[in-house]
Design a protein with these regions (language model features):
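Cysteine/selenocysteine-centered motifs that mediate thiol-based redox chemistry or coordinate metal-sulfur cofactors
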Residues: 2, 10, 96-142
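Charge-rich, low-complexity N-terminal segments
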Residues: 1-25
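Residues in flexible loops and secondary-structure boundaries
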Residues: 17, 39-41, 50-51, 69, ...
Length: 142
């Protein structure tokens, strides 16, 4: 469950997260343990998905860690330099670990983000499907 919400928060932009938070219960106060700070990470790849690993290149990542007043710690790593996104994601990660807050935050923030991501993926798949070539059909047309 945590892996899912951390992934959704990492892929959403700060404006979208903030808009969803406007409809959610107020987040608890927090203090920053680390960052937000931006750095580089080496990305690795594998030829064909299962070949020998190689260094593909570096990418920019922003990370943040926060602690809520009840002691719960939240973390976030996001691609790019958006410090606001990293901090919002870390605070939400910490808040979502509380079983009392989780249902309201899932309904107000995480589920709408998941639905938007699923719709975006479906649109992209439909767009790609429109350009698909059926080689069997081409062979029978000759």
């Amino acid at each position: 469950m945590r892996r899912r919400w951390m992934g959704l928060l990492a892929r959403a932009d700060a404006a979208t997260i903030a808009a969803r938070l406007a409809e959610a219960p107020a987040l608890p106060p927090h203090i920053r343990l680390r960052g937000p700070e931006t750095g580089l990470v080496m990305t690795r790849g594998r030829q064909g998905g299962d070949g020998a690993p190689f260094n593909l290149g570096e990418m920019t990542v922003t990370r943040c860690s926060v602690r809520l007043e009840d002691g719960t710690v939240g973390h976030a790593y996001v691609a790019g330099r958006d410090a606001r996104q990293a901090e919002l994601a870390a605070v939400l990660d910490a808040a979502l670990q509380d079983p009392d807050r989780r249902p309201a935050l899932l309904a107000a923030v995480i589920e709408p983000l998941a639905a938007a991501e699923a719709a975006r993926t479906a649109r992209e798949a439909a767009k790609a499907a429109a350009t698909r070539v059926e080689f069997f059909t081409m062979a029978t047309m000759r």
